[in-house]
Amino acid sequence: MDRMVVHRMPLWEKAAKFYIRDKEFRQWAEEAAGGETDPQRRVLRLMEWTRNVVKPIPSGLPFIDDHISHIVLRHYGNDGQLAEVFTALTTYTGNEGRWEAYSPPGASARVALCFVESEGKWWVLDIWNGGWFETPSGQIATIEDFKHPERLRRRGQAPELLGGVPYISYFQDVQGVFMRSFSRARGQMPWHRFLMIIGLEPEDGPGAYPRLRNP
């Protein structure tokens, strides 16, 4: 009979690995941003980098639920894991990111919607399918913009139909999805993690930071 061996990691080893993961993600975020200073263009660069580096799980390989940095090192993951990597990158480059999966009624697919904060509002993007919507002024659509979906146009690589329903259907409840959204990014940053431990900052669980500005 196989025996389970438990490795008890000493505190110094935990701290060292925590620091290494933080440093890795800062380096990846800097590389992915490519020096771009405009927030919208930078976010789209981060989307492109994530999709180029993290591919869908190869056929025959299992889904592995582990640390965000391991997803990048492994170079594959599912839709939620791509969303985790992307929102971690946006958080590290100054725009807080969160995500949650949503499947509209009648759809045979789901979309991991990513929410990226910009000046008190939240852009909405779909990393797995490479899609988002734009306003008439050419800006990435925010949660508030989806109150008038007829004014928006589909951009990126996402199809017009997905899972048997119009692609826009996956964005029909963005405010509700946002209220359930979460992030693990800030929890791997040393300063934020310390504040969480001593209770001065909430954990990055669902709805931890449901901030919406009225239009």
Where do the protein language model's features map onto the residues?
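A residue-identity detector for tryptophan
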Residues: 12, 19, 28, 49, ...
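Active-site neighborhood of thiol-dependent amide/isopeptide-bond enzymes
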Residues: 52-113, 117
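A general marker of short, structured functional hotspots
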Residues: 3, 8, 14-15, 21-24, ...
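Secondary-structure boundary elements
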Residues: 1-74
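Enriched - but not universal
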Residues: 15, 31, 52-54, 58, ...
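Loop/turn elements at helix/coil->beta-strand transitions in domains of secreted/extracellular proteins
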Residues: 38-44, 91-98, 119-122
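His-Asp-centered catalytic microenvironments across diverse enzyme cores
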Residues: 106-110, 116-215
